[in-house]
């Protein structure tokens, strides 16, 4: 599991594991913004995750950073590792649709989407997972939501999970 989380955060894949490109939120939007998919993209856009990178430019973030001796939170490793997807990923792992402006996007939790984003693969969960899809769990969240974070508040996984829930609606009929 750690290896998958490391890849989702943009670190190199361990030996013997495939490396896939990060396609960015745009790569997910086409399919995951439909009513049939529960408007999952809109749910993400309304979340703090989508604004995580931009939040580092706020006066509050700059104040917290200054207290920690950080000059620019939008350029510091301690901040970026949790405020954007694919931090430290080599350029060859970033598709042209990837953008740091996406903040903590789909691929932060679900892994690089290059291979599993195709509809024919996503229709089969097992096949999608074989092509890099990660089904996140509490450890995934706690890789960032932990006491090392300067603005940490107690993290209650079951409550947090409800705030970011984006299930696919059950088929009608």
Where are these regions (language model features)?
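Sequence context of c-type cytochrome heme-c attachment sites
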Residues: 8-102, 107, 113-136, 155-173
């Amino acid at each position: 599991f750690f290896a998958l989380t490391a890849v989702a955060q943009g670190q190199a894949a361990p030996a013997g594991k495939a490396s896939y490109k990060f396609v960015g939120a745009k790569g997910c939007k086409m399919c995951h913004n439909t009513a049939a998919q529960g408007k999952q993209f809109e749910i993400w856009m309304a979340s703090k995750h989508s604004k995580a990178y931009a939040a580092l430019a706020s006066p509050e973030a700059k104040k917290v950073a200054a207290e920690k001796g950080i000059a620019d939170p939008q350029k510091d490793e301690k901040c970026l590792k949790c405020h954007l997807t694919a931090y430290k990923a080599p350029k060859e792992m970033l598709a042209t649709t990837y953008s740091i402006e996406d903040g903590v996007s789909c691929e932060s939790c679900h892994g690089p989407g290059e291979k599993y984003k195709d509809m024919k693969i996503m229709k089969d969960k097992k096949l999608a997972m074989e092509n890099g899809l990660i089904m996140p769990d509490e450890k995934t969240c706690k890789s960032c939501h932990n006491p090392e974070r300067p603005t940490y508040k107690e993290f209650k996984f079951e409550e947090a999970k409800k705030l970011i829930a984006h299930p696919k609606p059950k088929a009608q009929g």
